[in-house]
């Protein structure tokens, strides 16, 4: 079976269990070659289940039935996870291979901690290697033992371990739990959300959110984890942090559209613009901003629409949109990115991969707030491959922008809160790049491709009472033509916020696309209360009335639209067709 095939089988068994189709789950697991190692335990659970069924059939009261069923579900989920790991071992999975390597070494996390501490104390170059080893160990172990948890806590509470290294290890816990569910790792992440350095807290909070989405159907079975999540929700900053993470997650889900838009519109038009502007003067050694200040270039750019598109993408970036994926996705082929650990490594200007070169420019790259860490490494590595003269030009251009960034940073009113936002944004972008570009990405579920059922996530679903967050989610669904989900979100938004013509129009359009014409008409009519002269709304409402058989009302609305747009040929044709 291929990696994709076994992941699909694992998901099928998991769905049986979570939907409480236990007989199908038993049958599927017992027929699976790689669950034979646990077949005795599976049969034990099956006999307990049959006993419950016999009690139920006999009408015997059993107050502990739900607890027993929950325990059976947890056991079956564990066996299903273990069988998947065994199968992936047979398929030579790189993740499972890493796990085997560390198991065969016989060295525990505590020993790796000692090695890292020793290397740091003497400023040895081996510290990088030991940090990578700890990351790989944490990420590759399917489940943490009690000792693993103890050693991991020691690492995170060791004041001598740099904050950047701890932030790196947070990502390792996330990757490990994302690859194979582990309540111990998730519990560790929850504890790291509560206190400590903002870089660690930001990554931990984002990791918990992403894992809660990944395992939204599974989490309610783990009562201790739910209790920890409820404790986390008591923190004063919880709701603000949750909103920041959720909004960045949805911004990241929009990356594919932004990338396609950049490639199809901005980049394509820039190429045409450059080709058409060869004769325009003052081109040499100028930045794009300088060129656009040149009167000739400025006029040409305005006529071509490029300046408008650049402003549009600048606005997208200012709102948290990921505009760098289009460029840096092509710069992830360096050997540096063959290592799992390096995709989540906080940017270090003096990292050994640079061989001591480019330190001045790397220091500037480190302070670019809108660029995620893996893109910073891509950028810095790409600069190593260009001639020194071109590199100097890049440095001179960056110095001016760097001063602007410093001034902007000095004007922040909430440095701690803005730092949290930056960490969350860049970390989630790093996760996005990993799941889309890592060469072994097929071993992982793409969190950005699954249905984001936030409303079903325990504790975190409180965010569905926040209008700005619900509006963002609704618009995300709407733009991607997920009309059923968008309609549900718009209904939620109308229940918790002030109504507007735009919300009613979008909601009406969703219901129209779902062929729920009575509901669509209701939404359009409410939109017209706010703005009775909107031709678009009048026409769409008329179409719904026409399909519903109310031709008289459709004609009235078409006539209203005609009065506003008398020369609209399409509108006149619609009226003529209705009058036939």
Model-predicted regions and their roles:
Residues 30, 187-190, 491, 525, ...:
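Alpha-solenoid helical repeat scaffolds
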Residues 2-58, 238-239, 247, 252-404:
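Non-catalytic protein-protein interaction scaffold segments in large eukaryotic complex-forming proteins
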Residues 22-23, 179, 483, 517, ...:
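TPR-repeat structural position
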């Amino acid at each position: 079976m291929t990696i994709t095939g076994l992941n699909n089988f694992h998901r099928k068994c998991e769905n049986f269990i979570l939907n409480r189709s236990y007989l199908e789950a038993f049958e599927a697991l017992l027929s699976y070659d790689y669950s034979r190692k646990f077949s005795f335990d599976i049969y034990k659970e099956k006999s307990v289940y049959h006993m419950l069924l016999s009690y139920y059939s006999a009408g015997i009261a059993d107050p502990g039935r739900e607890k027993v069923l929950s325990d059976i579900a947890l056991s079956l989920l564990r066996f299903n996870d273990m069988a998947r790991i065994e199968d992936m071992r047979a398929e030579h999975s790189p993740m499972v291979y890493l796990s085997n390597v560390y198991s065969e070494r016989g060295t525990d996390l505590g020993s790796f901690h000692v090695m890292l501490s020793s290397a740091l104390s003497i400023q040895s170059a081996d510290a990088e290697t030991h940090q990578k080893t700890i990351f790989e160990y944490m990420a590759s172990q399917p489940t943490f033992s009690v000792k693993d948890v103890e050693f991991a806590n020691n690492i995170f509470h060791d004041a001598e371990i740099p904050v950047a290294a701890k932030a790196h290890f947070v990502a390792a816990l996330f990757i490990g739990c994302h690859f194979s569910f582990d309540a111990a790792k998730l519990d560790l992440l929850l504890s790291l959300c509560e206190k400590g350095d903002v870089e660690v807290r930001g990554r931990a909070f984002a990791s918990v959110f992403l894992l809660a989405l990944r395992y939204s159907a599974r989490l309610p079975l783990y009562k201790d984890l739910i209790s920890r999540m409820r404790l986390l929700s008591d923190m004063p900053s919880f709701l603000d942090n949750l909103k920041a993470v959720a909004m960045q997650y949805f911004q990241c889900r929009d990356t594919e559209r932004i990338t396609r838009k950049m490639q199809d519109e901005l980049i394509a038009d820039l190429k045409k613009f450059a080709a058409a502007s060869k004769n325009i003067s003052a081109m040499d050694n100028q930045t794009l901003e300088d060129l656009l200040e040149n009167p000739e270039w400025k006029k040409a750019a305005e006529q071509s629409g490029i300046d408008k598109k650049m402003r549009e993408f600048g606005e997208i970036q200012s709102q948290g949109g990921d505009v760098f994926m289009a460029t840096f996705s092509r710069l992830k082929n360096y050997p540096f990115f063959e290592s799992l650990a390096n995709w989540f490594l906080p940017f270090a200007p003096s990292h050994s991969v640079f061989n001591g070169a480019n330190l001045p420019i790397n220091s500037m790259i480190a302070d670019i707030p809108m660029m995620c860490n893996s893109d910073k490494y891509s950028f810095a590595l790409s600069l190593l491959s260009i001639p020194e003269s071109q590199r100097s030009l890049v440095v001179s251009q960056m110095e001016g922008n760097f001063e602007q960034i410093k001034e902007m940073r000095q004007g922040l009113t909430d440095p701690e809160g803005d730092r949290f936002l930056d960490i969350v944004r860049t970390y989630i972008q790093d996760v996005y790049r990993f799941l889309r570009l890592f060469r072994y990405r097929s071993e992982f579920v793409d969190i950005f491709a699954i249905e984001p059922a936030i409303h079903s996530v325990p504790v975190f679903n409180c965010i569905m009472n926040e209008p700005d967050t619900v509006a963002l989610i609704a618009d995300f669904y709407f733009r991607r033509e997920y009309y059923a989900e968008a309609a549900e979100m718009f209904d939620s938004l109308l229940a918790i916020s002030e109504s507007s013509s735009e919300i009613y129009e979008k909601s009406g359009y969703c219901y129209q696309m779902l062929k729920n014409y009575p509901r669509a008409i209701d939404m359009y009519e409410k939109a017209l209360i706010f703005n009775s002269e909107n031709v678009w709304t009048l026409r769409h409402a008329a179409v719904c009335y026409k399909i519903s058989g109310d031709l008289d009302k459709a004609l009235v609305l078409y006539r209203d639209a005609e009065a506003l747009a008398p020369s609209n040929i399409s509108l006149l044709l619609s009226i003529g067709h209705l009058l036939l």
